[in-house]
A protein has these predicted regions:
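Basic, Lys/Arg- and aromatic-enriched nucleic-acid-binding interface segment
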Residues: 2-41, 45
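Short, cationic motifs built from Arg/Lys/His that form the positively charged side of catalytic pockets
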Residues: 26, 39-40, 74-80, 155
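Ca2+-coordinating acidic residues in Ca2+-binding motifs
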Residues: 43, 158, 189
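Short, basic, alpha-helical segments at the C-terminal edge of helix-turn-helix-like DNA-binding modules
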Residues: 202-212
Length: 213
């Protein structure tokens, strides 16, 4: 398991602000969507944003695109926007901007999205984004300050905020559902951020249920 290094809230805010100052609006939009909603990079091409600004991720990153398109296996999950302090409603505002199509995505990412159906894979979409981000100087500065930080740190940062940022943290089962993975996977990566009482309670309930079965 690679080290789980989150992009911390202050760094996330600074990165977004710098992207706007640098006129990198498309990079800003994609980075904001991934960071505010805890997405896998490739999921950017699976999003369905409704008129209220609610964000749904269509299915998982499956190889069989035809199954996805037919709806046979398509299970949308709701993604939760976690705001930054002092920016109420910003996640939803970003989602509505994404839905409007006013800004669009970086060209290299769009090129890969166009090839998704022939490749039956979304992996290159995420790789194209990661490459752009890694070449961006302010990101390189963040990596210097946080050795081991990767683009996936945007998603890890969402998990950190879910558990450590608010006085009312999400339960780990809720966070796992919003991130689109199992509770086991969630705890494998993020257990050190999860409320210890919750974990103890879960263990106790499990053992009680076992005895009463």
């Amino acid at each position: 398991v690679q080290a789980t290094i989150p992009l911390m809230p202050a760094d996330f805010e600074e990165l977004l602000s710098q992207m706007l100052q640098d006129g990198r609006k498309q990079l800003w939009l994609m980075t904001a969507m991934i960071g505010f909603y805890g997405l896998r990079e490739g999921e950017i091409c699976l999003l369905d944003v409704d008129e209220n600004g609610d964000v749904y991720v269509g299915g998982e990153l499956k190889r069989d695109v035809r199954a996805l398109q037919s709806g046979a296996e398509k299970e949308e999950r709701l993604a939760l926007g976690l705001d930054l302090k002092g920016q109420p409603g910003e996640a939803r505002r970003v989602a509505q901007l994404f839905r409007s199509g006013q800004i669009g995505l970086p060209k290299a990412v769009k090129n890969q999205i166009d090839k998704v159906s022939e490749r039956n894979s979304y992996r290159e979409v995420g790789a194209a984004y990661a490459q752009i981000l890694k070449r961006y100087k302010p990101w390189q500065e963040l990596v210097k300050r946080n050795p081991g930080l990767r683009p996936y740190g945007l998603r890890h940062g969402w998990a950190w905020r879910a558990h450590k940022y608010s006085s009312r943290p999400l339960h780990y089962s809720q966070a796992a559902a919003f991130m689109g993975h199992s509770v086991e996977t969630h705890l494998k990566y993020y257990s050190s951020w999860v409320n210890r009482k919750e974990l103890e309670e879960a263990g106790k309930k499990y053992n009680e249920a076992l005895q009463s079965a």
